[in-house]
């Protein structure tokens, strides 16, 4: 049983690490799939994509990420995500007793 738990733990860590490594590897296909033209550079695309990813994590749903990326990050969803993330950052931290 212990071996099984260890294997599952290691597999989880590897998948998390792999996903983090791939996060910064955006390609020309990403530009096309997000309906972006060449006027946006890859760094700007990465930053906007991070906003959508963080927003999806905040709302605990993947459907947000697709809507956020619509029309090269110009949708109302993207604006709402930016606003929600900014509001979340401005919330006072809860004190732990």
Curated annotation (Swiss-Prot):
Keywords: Disulfide bond, Secreted, Signal
Keyword Cytoplasm: no
MF GO annotations: neuropeptide hormone activity
Protein's UniProt keywords contain Secreted: yes
Function of the molecule: May increase the toxicity of alpha-latrotoxin and/or other venom components. Is non-toxic to mice and to the cockroach Periplaneta americana.
Family per similarity comment: Belongs to the arthropod CHH/MIH/GIH/VIH hormone family.
Protein name per the record: Alpha-latrotoxin associated low molecular weight protein 2
Originating species: Steatoda grossa
